[in-house]
Amino acid sequence: MALYQGAAFFMLVASCVCSTVFHREQQTWFEGVFLSSMCPVNVSAGTLYGIMFDAGSTGTRIHVYTFVQKVPDNTGQLPVLEGEIFDSVKPGLSAFVDQPKQGAETVQELLEVAKDSIPPSHWKRTPVVLKATAGLRLLPEEKAEALLFEVKEIFKKSPFLVPDDSVSIMDGSYEGILAWVTVNFLTGQLHGHNQETVGTLDLGGASTQITFLPQFEKTLEQTPRDYLTSFEMFNSTYKLYTHSYLGFGLKAARLATLGALETAGIDGYTFRSACLPRWLEAEWIFGGVKYQYGGNQEAGEVGFEPCYAEVLRVVQGKLHQPDEVQRGSFYAFSYYYDRAVDTDMIDYEKGGVLKVEDFERKAREVCDNLENFTSGSPFLCMDLSYITALLKDGFGFASSTVLQLTKKVNNIETGWALGATFHLLQSLGISH
């Protein structure tokens, strides 16, 4: 856990007031960056950059972060995070499982965004890294390695700094921890010593993560040991509850609901569900595999109740349920956010606050009107029902639990990429 104790958690320290003075013989790497909105830049400064690729199951995203570093002799001042350039492409790398060179070309396309965003004079000292998540974890190892090799070749041809470990598959728990740190840092929840933090819920295409700081000893006692991660900061020990569930992301859950998760797609066979419009006949490609799917055309039921029964089988009894989540505050993002936007429950730009029961209410509304479905995603009923089941019957949230749905905080994307970039800069000795 040395990585978590040092590398990933420098942002926790960074959330202190700007005038903080560190009394240590050796400054650890996480003492070096502050968010510019918290610590305005009023002196001459140098600029540095970091490029982080998030290779998810449904798309590849690039984050270009800009930092400002005060002049070297101004030792009382520390670098600040100035902003982020974000872009993405679809589908994800896993869709190119048998065409690795073609998959790497999508990364090349996004590298042009970095070149346009960073002055040429900084290219040689700007590190570029790609971390893949659940989409590549689900692939056979040799297939995933072939994709990563081609991406590394693209990086080597770029004008940027390419570390030895520039391309890798990230552990799911690392994903959850860094997302928790990022959200709590950006929202200012880690200021001071009261440890009043928020939990985080991340719903990707192939996996989902839940992370929070337990407040009750009972939670620690009843939680499996591999769900807890400890680290130290300011002479205090933090113990996070965090777990990543591979195969429980939104897209993987569709396959599980259809009964297609363990298959490679069967020619001529159509997977059917009560969660889909009765007349629907369609094809869907996920992870480079084509699936035929449709509704219950004749005697089969459709609507919320039969649909919920289908998605319930995917999650019931398969996830750990800490009692404490019913009383906690949580930020939810990724597909939680996207589906709430798709159904006009929240504003795309501002996000919003929802209760778990709001997802169930919207699921009932959509599913019980499948016969009138005309546009949008045919999976909307299934997705909303799955989100409801995941929250209530999977994680054990109460219907009244309030969730903050957000995509950005202080104009910075939520998720793990910011923390990973901080770690990258320090590991290369760039952040000071």
UniProtKB/Swiss-Prot annotation:
N-glycosylated; high-mannose type. The keyword Signal applies. One of its GO terms (cellular component) is extracellular region. Glycans are attached at residues 235, 372. The active site is at residue 175. It is found in: Endoplasmic reticulum; Secreted. It catalyses: a ribonucleoside 5'-diphosphate + H2O = a ribonucleoside 5'-phosphate + phosphate + H(+); GDP + H2O = GMP + phosphate + H(+); UDP + H2O = UMP + phosphate + H(+); IDP + H2O = IMP + phosphate + H(+). InterPro entries: GDA1_CD39_NTPase (IPR000407). Keywords: Calcium, Disulfide bond, Endoplasmic reticulum, Glycoprotein, Hydrolase, Magnesium, Secreted, Signal. Pfam families: GDA1_CD39. It comes from the Eukaryota. Pathway: Protein modification; protein glycosylation. Residues 1-24 form the signal peptide. Its EC number is 3.6.1.6. Its cofactor is Ca(2+); Mg(2+). The keyword Secreted applies. Monomer; active form. Homodimer; disulfide-linked. Homodimers are enzymatically inactive. Hydrolyzes nucleoside diphosphates with a preference for GDP, IDP and UDP compared to ADP and CDP. In the lumen of the endoplasmic reticulum, hydrolyzes UDP that acts as an end-product feedback inhibitor of the UDP-Glc:glycoprotein glucosyltransferases. UMP can be transported back by an UDP-sugar antiporter to the cytosol where it is consumed to regenerate UDP-glucose. Therefore, it positively regulates protein reglucosylation by clearing UDP from the ER lumen and by promoting the regeneration of UDP-glucose. Belongs to the GDA1/CD39 NTPase family. This is Ectonucleoside triphosphate diphosphohydrolase 5. It comes from Bos taurus (Bovine).
